[in-house]
Amino acid sequence: MAEITAALVKELRETTGAGMMDCKKALSETNGDLEAAIDWLRKKGLSAAAKKSGRVAAEGLVGVASAPQTAAMVEVNAETDFVARNELFQAFVTETARVALTVGEDVEAIKAAPYPGTERTVAEQLTHLVATIGENMNIRRARVLSVPQGVVASYIHSPVKPGLGKIGVLVAVESASEISALETLGRQVGMQVAAANPHSLDTDNVDPAALEREKAVLTEQARASGKPEAIIEKMVEGRIRKYYEEVVLLEQVWVHDGESRVKAIVKNAGAKLTGFARFQLGEGVEKGPESDFAAEVAAAAGLA
């Protein structure tokens, strides 16, 4: 049996909000498997958390750049927020996003590409910047979206400068409609993605493993009610619909009015969403408490 360490118990407590003894029991029952322990607690009704809290650890900036029918987004990390406010660093993030527009989203290809206005590559310019500022930096990831007709809109939450911030979103909108209207729609959808953090564009693209895991947890929760299997099945179906409303962009409630569905808004605009990307600075690495981005975006949309 795996050793149940204090650190493991602490991590499970922070992730789920469950009590120490419940966390110890969950880890014992699941042989120290953290993910399985989270599910065990949820099945017992002892966890309010449906997923790990993606705490933010890295500093730096997310940057976007656009061209007709395409857009790129990069995340460049630094050690401190002080560097993120440095104009040289900000310029590097902006130029790196522009390079990604040309060479694509492969980070190694971006690093090997010429850095605009110099005889250096992007990687060499980064090394030069590290030596100049005296702090380690890294191009963490990049994403490029394109459409054959329409726009790829971008949205930066609370930008420190145009195209630079800590949360960035790209939204691919296909349509023959007027470009300015599509850009407005795309920006509104971008705010939706920033606030609601969907995992999938539509129900067909939901991770099958994640869906089966959710069904298993919901079924166990429903069975705890003691109701007949036929009723349990209906309960699970309803809860899966609710799950889709949380994780699927097109099924979500439109944050701008609190009533409509995203899919209805897009359809009424005569458009089709073909993809989206969301970068949150340092996503997936734990740190201290972060601000409520959903509330901030709602405020920016005039709904708070």
UniProtKB/Swiss-Prot annotation:
Q: Does the keyword Protein biosynthesis apply?
A: yes
Main localization category: cytoplasm
- Which Gene Ontology cellular-component terms appear in the entry? cytoplasm
Residue ranges, annotated region (Involved in Mg(2+) ion dislocation from EF-Tu)? 80-83
InterPro entries assigned: EF-Ts_dimer_sf, Transl_elong_EFTs/EF1B, Transl_elong_EFTs/EF1B_dimer, Transl_elong_Ts_CS, UBA-like_sf
Keywords linked to the UniProt accession: Cytoplasm, Elongation factor, Protein biosynthesis
State a single Gene Ontology molecular function: translation elongation factor activity
Subcellular locations according to the entry: Cytoplasm
| Xref: CDD domains | UBA_EF-Ts (cd14275)
Q: Which SUPFAM superfamilies match?
A: Elongation factor Ts (EF-Ts), dimerisation domain, UBA-like
Which Pfam families did the record assign? EF_TS
Family stated for the protein in its record:
Belongs to the EF-Ts family.
Q: What does this protein do?
A: Associates with the EF-Tu.GDP complex and induces the exchange of GDP to GTP. It remains bound to the aminoacyl-tRNA.EF-Tu.GTP complex up to the GTP hydrolysis stage on the ribosome.
Q: What is this protein called?
A: Elongation factor Ts
